Amino acid sequence: MVKSKRNVVVNMTKVTKNPGEKKKKLVSTIKDIVDQYKFIYLFTFENMRNNKLKSVRTEWSTSKFLFGKNKVLSVGLGKSEEDELKPNLHKLTEHLEGECGLFFTNEPKDKVFEYFTNYSEKDFPRSGFVSEETITIKEGPIVGMTHSMETYLRGLGLPTTLKNGVIFVDREYTLCEAGVAVTPEQSQLLKLFNHEISEFKFHIKGFWNEDEFTLCEEESQEE
């Protein structure tokens, strides 16, 4: 006897993201807030962490951070004297390179420079991070780690054995090497052994204020 089958309706439509709308929103945001702030800072950053950036945003709740593609940020501020939102903003956009962002604020310049120059937050390195130091783990027992972790550690490349319920490192092992990018496996090992060698920090490239753009001394020397 043939069993009847229910017709199944398959929706073949696919929801596509509209990157154009996101760009328009960012450009619109820049145009909306540029009159609200006296200073616009251009900064670069290293080893960005969203959770730590969230804390920074909270500390500067009356100011505004903006991130996006440099080309879009340039469009928002203006690429030339003809289309810039404020006099000399095009000079700021000329330096939008690499990983950077914009910081809009009315806070005093000295306060901003003091904060961002001294800001530094340690974290565990991600894959691709280039270490400034070589870290090794010595041969012998691992203290404070349960025996059930041995297989996992070995899978990450650490030469280990289990002896009487204790994990032993069979020989000295390099967790990371100075000047060499960290692998995904090394990233996990460094975290397991509590090595926070990555540092999230900012570098101010320049700032716009009162219709003038000032390039920071360090940046001008590099150029």
Swiss-Prot record:
Gene3D superfamilies: 3.30.70.1730, 3.90.105.20. Keywords: Cytoplasm, Nucleus, Ribosome biogenesis. It is found in: Nucleus, Nucleolus; Cytoplasm. The keyword Nucleus applies. InterPro entries: Mrt4 (IPR033867), Ribosomal_uL10 (IPR001790), Ribosomal_uL10-like_insert (IPR040637), Ribosomal_uL10-like_insert_sf (IPR043164), Ribosomal_uL10-like_sf (IPR043141), Ribosome_Assembly_uL10 (IPR051742). The keyword Cytoplasm applies. It comes from the Eukaryota. Transmembrane segments: none annotated. SUPFAM superfamilies: Ribosomal protein L10-like. One of its GO terms (biological process) is ribosomal large subunit assembly. GO terms for cellular component: cytoplasm; nucleolus; preribosome, large subunit precursor. Its main location: nucleus. Component of the ribosome assembly machinery. Nuclear paralog of the ribosomal protein P0, it binds pre-60S subunits at an early stage of assembly in the nucleolus, and is replaced by P0 in cytoplasmic pre-60S subunits and mature 80S ribosomes. Associates with the pre-60S ribosomal particle. Belongs to the universal ribosomal protein uL10 family. This is Ribosome assembly factor mrt4. It comes from Dictyostelium discoideum (Social amoeba). The lineage of its organism: Eukaryota, Amoebozoa, Evosea, Eumycetozoa, Dictyostelia.
